[in-house]
């Protein structure tokens, strides 16, 4: 999933140079969604790992 996020990020940067038009603008939107999902998963799993670590002490 992170590979796709990086791919769409690169396409999004290229789109920014050319003004976010057409299909590339859609790629930038997809990159934002994938990035936010990855951040949400990192936060979720960090909280779960912290709780599990605290429980086993």
From Swiss-Prot:
This is UPF0391 membrane protein Patl_0263. It is a multi-pass membrane protein. It is found in: Cell membrane. Belongs to the UPF0391 family. GO terms for cellular component: plasma membrane. Keywords: Cell membrane, Membrane, Transmembrane, Transmembrane helix. Pfam families: DUF1328. The chain crosses the membrane at residues 8-28, 30-50. The keyword Cell membrane applies. It comes from the Bacteria. Its main location: membrane. HAMAP family: UPF0391 (MF_01361). The keyword Transferase does not apply.
């Amino acid at each position: 999933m992170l590979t796709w996020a990086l791919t769409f990020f690169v396409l999004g940067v290229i789109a920014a140079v050319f003004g976010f038009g057409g299909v590339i603008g859609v790629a930038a939107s997809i990159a934002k969604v994938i990035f936010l999902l990855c951040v949400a998963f990192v936060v979720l799993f960090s909280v779960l790992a912290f709780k599990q670590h605290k429980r086993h002490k």
